[in-house]
């Protein structure tokens, strides 16, 4: 398509963006409506200004549906659909995702035509927008930052380029770069609460068999683009570290998993962009190892600094993108050439090699799934593991257990309130948790437990007030189990007494095994 008429395309996208304010979900929030209209107006103004400046130019529009774009978009879209089925906020935010797509197309067109005469129209913005929305959303009152994040991503793709194997290509993935930049800004300003980042990282584990789902949706891209080695090396590096950490400390490094689901997602659909990753097979292995190790390091660094840890899979990707030339050079060096996978099976065609690596990855994943390395039943998500670890004096176990108990107390468990108070008292005496040095902080938990009908909570509130007597523990009631059995998977479906006792027994609540009427 040639001529000035194609300048109407970005305007059409901008007007479609403005038209979203007619939706009730947008109209009821004046700030969101203002952001949508403001973004649309800015795009229209840019288009008008550009139209006046480009009168003597012959602009072109080329349609090219690249396999890399639509395969990635299908995988990411599948995750959004499956995740949204179990966390309705995703579906409720569909108009926000649509707004970002409309903005991305208009912005990308105008930016490209500002620098050259041809624009390639395809599915390119889809994987960028879907990828960003799998990891970070700004809340409605701050949604203008979402548009700014998209603009930064496409600008980085257009302006930050280098020569790679004789071609002028972009350095950074257009979704991972703005994610890292804005993550740094949020950390620096302490403004993580204006995003859904924490909720995203938590709720992505809600759907059943999410690890298996991510494994399966990653297979087409691994076959077509040969990215298996990156994913497999990243997963294995993190998993092996977790095994060593467990053997050394007796607890799990990531607390409720060997590899958090959001990190596992990043290992499949974030850092594996074939355009911004190494070309050599050994380089891709090293790339994955570095991603796994850097995720571990960032999780520890952020956690120790009291910062949100959900940035652990985002911050390092641009630095890894900068390393790809060096990793490929290292992989081709005389030092490592002999151990490169390229020396094995040289007669195999590329897709045959991809299938071979995918087969190895499938065996590795099946083994991890069978040994609870991944899956829905990791013991670290349940209270009994942490109660046992706390009693054994494992590092960080008691403070983490206290946090879990406070969370269940807030959800309505009187037993958990009493346990949170008891552990608060113990931690105030041991000094292990700097947040719980004042014993008086246990009073609120005991009072909440008492208000919910736990006699031990009433007794402990009096004991704490008088500073004399012994504190008393209680047993979970049938009303507590729907709350304290939820783990990291969200609300449980079981509600009948027999089902609850059976589930509790499965999770190693020994008292539940004795209380189950069917086992008496």
Please identify what each model-predicted range represents.
Residues 46-61, 104-117, 152-168, 215-225, ...:
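C-terminal ends of transmembrane helices
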Residues 111-203:
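Membrane-interface helix-loop-helix junctions at boundaries between adjacent transmembrane segments
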Residues 147, 367-434, 440-444, 448, ...:
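Membrane-interface segments at or immediately adjacent to transmembrane helices
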Residues 178, 186-239, 243:
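Internal active-site segments that recognize and position negatively charged phosphoryl groups
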Residues 392-395, 405-406, 411-414, 420, ...:
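Short helix-capping/linker turns of helical repeat alpha-solenoids
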């Amino acid at each position: 398509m040639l001529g000035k008429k194609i300048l109407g395309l970005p305007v059409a996208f901008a007007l479609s963006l403005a038209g979203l304010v007619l939706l009730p979900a947008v109209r009821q929030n004046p700030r969101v409506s203002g952001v949508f209209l403001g973004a649309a107006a800015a795009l229209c103004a840019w288009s008008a200004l550009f139209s006046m400046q480009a009168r003597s130019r012959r602009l072109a529009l080329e349609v090219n549906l690249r396999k890399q774009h639509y395969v990635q978009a299908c995988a990411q879209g599948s995750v959004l659909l499956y995740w949204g089925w179990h966390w309705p906020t995703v579906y409720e935010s569909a108009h926000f995702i649509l707004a970002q797509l409309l903005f991305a197309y208009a912005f990308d067109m105008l930016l490209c035509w500002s620098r050259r005469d041809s624009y390639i129209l395809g599915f390119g913005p889809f994987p960028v927008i879907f990828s960003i929305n799998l990891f970070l959303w700004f809340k409605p009152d701050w949604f203008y930052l979402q548009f700014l994040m998209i603009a930064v991503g496409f600008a980085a793709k257009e302006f930050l380029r280098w020569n790679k194997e004789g071609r002028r290509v972009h350095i950074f993935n257009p979704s991972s770069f703005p994610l890292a930049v804005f993550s740094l800004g949020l950390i620096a300003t302490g403004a993580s609460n204006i995003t859904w980042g924490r909720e995203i990282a938590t709720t992505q584990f809600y759907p059943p068999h999410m690890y298996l789902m991510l494994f399966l949706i990653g297979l087409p891209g691994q076959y077509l683009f040969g990215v298996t080695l990156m994913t497999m090396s990243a997963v294995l590096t993190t998993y092996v570290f977790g095994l060593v950490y467990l053997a050394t400390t007796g607890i799990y490094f990531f607390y409720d998993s060997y590899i958090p689901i959001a990190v596992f997602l990043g290992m499949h659909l974030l850092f594996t962009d074939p355009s911004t990753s190494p070309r050599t097979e050994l380089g891709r292995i090293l790339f994955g190892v570095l991603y796994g190790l850097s995720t571990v390091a960032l999780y520890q660094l952020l956690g120790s600094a009291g910062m949100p840890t959900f940035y652990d899979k985002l911050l390092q990707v641009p630095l890894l993108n900068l390393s790809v030339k060096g990793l490929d050079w290292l992989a081709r060096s005389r030092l490592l050439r002999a151990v490169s996978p390229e020396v094995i099976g040289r007669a195999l065609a590329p897709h045959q090699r991809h299938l071979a690596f995918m087969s190895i990855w499938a065996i590795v994943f099946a083994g991890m799934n069978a040994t609870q390395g991944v899956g829905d039943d990791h013991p670290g998500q349940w209270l009994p593991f942490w109660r046992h670890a706390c009693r054994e004096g494992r590092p960080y176990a008691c403070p983490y257990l206290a946090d879990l108990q406070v969370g269940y107390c807030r959800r309505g468990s009187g037993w958990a309130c009493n346990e949170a108070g008891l552990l608060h008292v113990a931690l105030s005496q041991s000094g292990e948790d700097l947040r719980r040095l004042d014993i008086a902080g246990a009073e609120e938990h005991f009072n909440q437990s008492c208000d919910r009908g736990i006699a031990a909570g009433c007794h402990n509130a009096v004991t704490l007030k008088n500073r004399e007597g012994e504190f008393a523990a209680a047993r979970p009631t049938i009303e507590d189990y729907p709350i304290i059995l939820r783990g990291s998977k969200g609300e449980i479906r079981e509600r009948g007494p027999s089902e609850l006792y059976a589930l509790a027994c499965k999770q190693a609540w020994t008292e539940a095994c004795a209380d189950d009427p069917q086992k008496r």
